[in-house]
């Protein structure tokens, strides 16, 4: 029997920091900006750490060019994660608690603010790739969870879950990688939750349904913090005791590999399982040539000539 002190709860938050989407929000003179979203993420992270002193936190920014850890930052150490004082970092030293705040929260907030500032100031939007690298961010989160599991002591147990705060639209180009990540999370018993700010995400609906997580499209973006604390702060054990939003209808249509459109009926390659909306004699993914079975050719029957009497 594992006690509460020996049970670690790791929450990995993935924030969509697509500069194009957030730039459009700024042009609309919206009350909800990226800085307010990061503030809400900080409050959620602080609340998670306050729930139990053994709770752990990681924050990843999903950008158009990279996936970067906001917390722990570049100088984060595994010793920090599991409470080993170790040697203090020479490059980054948090200012400490000046108002009686828990020092871990102060350090986390400062690291997140510093990393997001560095990420956004160095963003280069030139080029055609303007989609959020969400599949890569989820893969990075799974790798981080796997690495943390190896550091857990023998008498401890760690439960992990991933929360995705999605802003930009889905990328059909990432469909295959996204589905691979979803099934990898399911195999490791890792929940994927989704908090969608704008249009619904069919990929995240599938991810939440397959892994047993919660999917929520925020009705009002300025109220993001309230929904984060109400729906996504409780872990999987506490959710059974709460009245949460009902599950949404999941769109399980697949995206074709030729036009990236969602289809109900299509053609599947028997070698690589790629899906196409139109028939092609050669698979464009694995270049397999299909043997087309033609209908059998029937020989024409010879007409019998009538004998003249």
Swiss-Prot record:
GO terms for cellular component: core TFIIH complex portion of holo TFIIH complex; nucleus; transcription factor TFIIH core complex; transcription factor TFIIH holo complex. InterPro entries: TFIIH_Tfb4/GTF2H3 (IPR004600), vWFA_dom_sf (IPR036465). GO terms for biological process: nucleotide-excision repair; regulation of DNA-templated transcription; transcription by RNA polymerase II. Keywords: DNA damage, DNA repair, Metal-binding, Nucleus, Transcription, Transcription regulation, Zinc, Zinc-finger. A zinc finger (C4-type) spans 269-286. It is found in: Nucleus. GO terms for molecular function: zinc ion binding. It comes from the Eukaryota. The keyword Metal-binding applies. The keyword Secreted does not apply. It holds the Pfam family Tfb4. Belongs to the TFB4 family. PANTHER family: GENERAL TRANSCRIPTION FACTOR IIH SUBUNIT 3, TRANSCRIPTION INITIATION FACTOR IIH TFIIH , POLYPEPTIDE 3-RELATED. Part of a TFIID-containing RNA polymerase II pre-initiation complex that is composed of TBP and at least GTF2A1, GTF2A2, GTF2E1, GTF2E2, GTF2F1, GTF2H2, GTF2H3, GTF2H4, GTF2H5, GTF2B, TCEA1, ERCC2, ERCC3, TAF1, TAF2, TAF3, TAF4, TAF5, TAF6, TAF7, TAF8, TAF9, TAF10, TAF11, TAF12 and TAF13. Component of the 7-subunit TFIIH core complex composed of XPB/ERCC3, XPD/ERCC2, GTF2H1, GTF2H2, GTF2H3, GTF2H4 and GTF2H5, which is active in NER. Component of the general transcription and DNA repair factor IIH (TFIIH) core complex, which is involved in general and transcription-coupled nucleotide excision repair (NER) of damaged DNA and, when complexed to CAK, in RNA transcription by RNA polymerase II. In NER, TFIIH acts by opening DNA around the lesion to allow the excision of the damaged oligonucleotide and its replacement by a new DNA fragment. In transcription, TFIIH has an essential role in transcription initiation. This is General transcription factor IIH subunit 3. It comes from Bos taurus (Bovine). The gene is GTF2H3.
């Amino acid at each position: 029997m594992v006690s509460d002190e020996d049970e670690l709860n790791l929450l990995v938050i993935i924030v969509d920091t697509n500069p194009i989407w957030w730039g459009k929000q700024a042009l609309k003179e919206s009350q909800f900006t990226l800085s307010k979203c990061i503030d809400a993420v900080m409050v959620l992270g602080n609340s998670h750490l306050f729930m139990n002193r053994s709770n752990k936190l990681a924050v990843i920014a999903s950008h158009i060019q990279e996936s970067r850890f906001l917390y722990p930052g570049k100088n984060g150490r595994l010793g920090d994660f599991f409470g080993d004082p170790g040697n203090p970092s020479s490059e980054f030293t948090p200012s400490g608690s000046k108002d009686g705040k828990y020092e871990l929260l102060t350090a986390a907030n400062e690291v997140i603010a510093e990393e997001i500032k560095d990420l956004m100031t160095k963003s280069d939007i030139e080029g055609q790739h303007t989609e959020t690298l969400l599949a890569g961010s989820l893969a990075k989160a799974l790798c981080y969870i796997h690495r943390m599991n190896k550091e857990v002591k023998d008498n401890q147990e760690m439960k992990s879950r991933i929360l995705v705060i999605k802003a930009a639209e889905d990328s059909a180009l990432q469909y295959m990688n996204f589905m691979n990540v979803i099934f990898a999370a399911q195999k490791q018993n890792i929940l994927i939750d989704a908090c969608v700010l704008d249009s619904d995400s069919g990929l995240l609906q599938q991810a939440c349904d397959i892994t047993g997580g919660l999917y929520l499209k925020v009705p009002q973006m300025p109220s993001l913090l309230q929904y984060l604390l109400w729906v996504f702060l409780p872990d999987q054990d506490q959710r059974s005791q709460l009245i949460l939003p009902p599950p949404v209808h999941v769109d399980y249509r697949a995206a074709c590999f030729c036009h990236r459109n969602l289809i109900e009926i299509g053609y599947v390659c028997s070698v690589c399982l790629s899906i196409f909306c139109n028939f092609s004699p050669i698979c464009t993914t694995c270049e397999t040539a299909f043997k087309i079975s033609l209908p059998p050719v029937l020989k024409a029957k010879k007409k019998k000539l009538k004998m003249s009497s």
